[in-house]
A protein has these predicted regions:
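Iron-sulfur-associated redox domains of electron-transfer enzymes in respiratory
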Residues: 4-5, 12-90, 213-589
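A short, structure-level motif marking secondary-structure boundaries and short turns
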Residues: 5-8, 102, 143-145, 185-187, ...
Length: 589
C-alpha cells in the first residue's frame, strides 16, 4: 500500500494518501487541539469545516499558518505544531471565541466537561482580553433537549451529525458572518420540528449550547418525599459507561452502581435487563406470529418486522416515514414495559397506590425522556415511568452524595424485577436486540436447543449488517442498522417493496445505546465505544442464563400475572400503537 512520509515536530510519520495533519499527528502521539474537528471513522461521522482555526500549524515553505484539519499530508512535508507563533495564534483565536461567549462557567451545566473550557485551561488563557457583541440569548427546550444558542461557537458538529449522519435535518446554520446562528427551520421550537430527540447533537457539542433537559431536581424531590416509594431501573448500556466519570472507563460497574443507587435513597433497585427479557418474549412472539403467517402465503402481513426498543428510531418513523408504522413491532420498549409492570403488578403486590409508586429510569438516552412523557404510556394521567434521567445525570447525583465510587462495595439488584439473562444485557449495543431475539425465537419455533449462542456475524460497528439464520430448514433473513442515515437506506427499500428481510433491528444512535445521547462524552474516542460493547458481551458470557425465555422471573410473571406472550393482558400493558407525527411546516408571516 502506498504511503506518505512527513516530519511532524521532528518525528517521522507514515500515513495513507489523503490523511490530514490532525490524523497524521495523532498516529505518532501528537495531539493537535481542535474544537470543530471530529472524525469517527467506523461510525461514518466526520466534521471538518475548518472554522475554528484552533488547529493551525506551521508548514515549512508556506507563509501562512495552515489549519491542520483541512491540510492533506504530502511527501516530505515538514510540520511544526507548537512554535511560539503557533501558540500565540491559537491563544488569540481562542480569546476571540471567548469574547462572544457568556462568562457562566461556574453555573454552566457542562462545567468540567466543556471542550472550550478545557482548551482555555490548556492554552493558558488567564484573562478576557477582548469583549465583543455576544450572540442574542435564545433558549429552546423539549422534554429531551435544551438549546442555548448564546453558548454556540458555530463548530457545526451538530449540523453534520444531524444532517449527514442521522439524515434528520432538524438543525442548520443560517445567516452570514456575525449574524450566523444555528437554528431549526423557520426558527420553530425544536419540539414541533422533525427532530427525533436522538441526542447525537448533544453527544458531539463541545459546549453546553446543546444539552439534555435535566430531571435531577425532580428525582431528588421524590426521594425526599416520605409518602412516596421510589424505584429505579437501569438500562444495560449505563453500567458500561457510568464508570468513565469515575476513572473506570470501558468497564462494567454493575455492582457499584446498584450500591450507589441504594445510598442515594431508592427503595428498590431494579434492572431494565429484566424488561429486556420481557421485550424479547413479546417481540419474539410477535415476529414468529407474523413470520408464520407470511410463510403460509398471507401477504397482508407487514414484513419485515422492525424493532421498537429505540424511541429515537420510533420517532424517526412517525415523523419521517409514518406510512411504515405498521412494520414496527407493537411491543413497547424495555423502559416502558418495566414501568407498566412496576405500576400494574409490583405496586399492587406491595399494597402501594400507583400514584405513590414513583418509577425512575436511568438511561443512556435523552429520547427516553420524551418517550416517558408520551400520554399513552400511563393510566388516568399517572405515567408508567415518572422520571427518566441519563447516565450523565446519575453521575452528577453520585457526586452530590459525596461517594467515592471506586471504593463502593458491590451489590445485586432487587428481586423480582432485577433478575435477567445475558440476552437482556446485550440490548445495549448494536445487534444485541436481534441476537437476543434469535436465541429465543429459534428455540420456541423449532423446539430445539440453539446450536450456538454467540452470533458474531451480527456484531461489530459496520453501519448495516445482515445474516440468514437457519430456523431448522426455514431461512430467516435479518438485518441490523445503527445510525438513522443507515436506517433511512433500509426504510426506503421497504417503502419501494425491495426489502429481502424478515426482521430488522434499528438503533438511532451510531453504535447503539453504548453511544446514546445521554452517555458520558466520548470526545471522538471510538476505542472507548468498542470497550463498552466488549464489556456488555463479557457480562453476557458470564451470565448463568443467556436466553430470555429461561429467566425464572419472566416465567413467574407470565404464570402469576400476564398469562402468555402477546395474550390479552400482555397486549393491554406491554404493547402500543404509533401515530403520524410528520410536522407540517408553515412559514411564519
Amino acid at each position: 500500500m502506498e504511503t506518505i512520509k512527513l516530519t511532524i515536530d521532528n518525528q517521522t510519520a507514515e500515513v495513507a494518501p489523503g490523511t490530514n495533519l490532525v490524523e497524521a499527528a495523532a498516529s505518532i502521539g501528537i495531539k493537535i487541539p481542535t474544537l470543530c474537528y471530529l472524525n469517527l471513522h467506523e461510525l461514518g461521522c466526520k466534521n471538518a469545516p475548518g472554522v475554528c482555526r484552533i488547529c493551525v500549524v506551521e508548514v515549512e515553505g508556506r507563509k501562512n499558518l495552515a489549519p491542520a484539519c483541512k491540510t492533506v499530508c504530502t511527501e516530505g512535508m515538514v510540520v511544526r505544531t507548537h512554535t511560539p507563533r503557533v501558540i500565540n495564534a491559537r491563544q488569540t483565536i481562542l480569546e476571540l471565541i471567548l469574547s462572544d461567549h457568556p462568562n457562566e462557567c461556574l453555573t454552566c451545566s457542562k462545567n468540567g466537561y466543556c471542550s472550550l473550557q478545557t482548551m482555555a485551561k490548556d492554552l493558558g488563557i488567564r484573562e478576557a482580553k477582548y469583549k465583543g457583541e455576544t450572540t442574542k440569548p435564545m433558549m429552546d427546550l423539549s422534554p429531551s433537549v435544551v438549546r442555548n444558542m448564546e453558548k454556540c461557537i458555530l463548530c457545526r458538529r451538530c449540523e453534520t451529525v444531524c444532517n449527514q449522519v442521522q439524515t434528520v435535518g432538524a438543525l442548520s446554520v443560517v445567516g452570514r458572518g456575525f449574524t450566523s446562528v444555528l437554528c431549526t427551520a423557520f426558527n420553530d421550537p425544536i419540539l414541533t420540528t422533525n427532530c427525533v430527540n436522538c441526542g447525537q447533537c448533544v453527544a458531539v457539542c463541545p459546549t453546553s449550547a446543546l444539552s439534555e433537559n435535566s430531571n435531577i431536581r425532580e428525582v431528588m424531590q421524590a426521594l425526599a418525599d416520605p409518602g412516596k416509594t421510589v424505584v429505579v431501573q437501569t438500562a444495560p448500556a449505563v453500567r458500561v459507561a457510568l464508570g468513565q466519570d469515575f476513572g473506570l472507563e470501558g468497564r462494567s460497574v454493575t455492582g457499584k452502581m446498584t450500591t450507589a443507587l441504594r445510598r442515594l435513597g431508592f427503595d428498590y433497585v431494579f434492572d431494565t435487563d429484566f424488561a429486556a427479557d420481557l421485550t424479547i418474549m413479546e417481540e419474539g412472539t410477535e415476529l414468529l406470529q407474523r413470520l408464520n403467517k407470511y410463510l403460509a402465503g398471507d401477504r397482508t402481513v407487514k414484513i419485515p418486522l422492525m424493532t421498537s426498543c429505540c424511541p429515537g428510531w420510533v420517532s424517526f418513523v412517525e415523523k419521517h416515514f409514518p406510512e411504515l408504522g405498521e412494520n414496527l413491532s407493537t411491543a413497547k420498549s424495555p423502559q416502558q414495559m418495566f414501568g407498566a409492570i412496576a405500576k400494574n403488578y409490583l405496586a399492587p403486590k406491595l399494597g402501594i397506590d400507583r400514584r405513590n409508586f414513583i418509577v425512575v429510569s436511568v438511561m443512556p438516552c435523552v429520547a427516553k425522556k420524551s418517550e416517558a412523557a408520551r400520554p399513552e404510556f400511563g393510566k388516568d394521567g399517572d405515567p408508567d415511568v415518572n422520571i427518566s434521567i441519563t447516565t450523565r445525570e446519575l453521575a452528577h447525583m453520585i457526586r452530590f452524595a459525596n461517594m467515592n465510587f471506586d471504593e463502593l462495595e458491590e451489590s445485586d439488584f432487587d428481586r423480582p424485577l432485577g433478575e435477567s439473562t445475558g440476552a437482556g444485557v446485550i440490548f445495549g449495543t448494536t445487534g444485541g436486540v436481534i441476537e437476543a431475539a434469535v436465541r429465543t425465537a429459534y428455540e420456541i419455533q423449532t423446539k430445539k436447543t440453539l446450536p450456538k449462542l454467540d452470533f458474531t456475524e451480527l456484531r461489530g460497528l459496520a453501519g448495516i449488517r445482515s445474516a440468514t439464520i437457519d430456523f431448522d430448514g426455514v431461512p430467516v433473513k435479518i438485518c441490523i442498522a445503527h445510525g438513522l442515515g443507515n436506517a433511512r437506506r433500509l426504510v426506503e427499500e421497504i417503502r419501494a417493496g425491495r426489502s429481502p428481510y424478515h426482521a430488522i433491528e434499528i438503533m438511532a444512535c451510531p453504535g447503539g445505546c453504548i453511544n446514546g445521547g445521554g452517555q458520558p462524552y466520548h470526545r471522538g474516542n471510538e476505542e472507548l465505544l468498542k470497550r463498552r460493547a466488549e464489556a456488555l458481551y463479557a457480562e453476557d458470557a458470564a451470565k448463568p442464563l443467556r436466553k430470555s425465555h429461561e429467566n425464572p422471573g419472566i416465567q413467574a410473571l407470565y404464570e402469576e400475572f400476564l398469562g402468555e406472550p402477546c395474550g390479552p393482558l400482555s397486549h393491554e400493558l406491554l404493547h402500543t400503537r404509533y401515530y403520524d407525527r410528520k410536522p407540517v411546516v408553515e412559514p411564519k408571516k
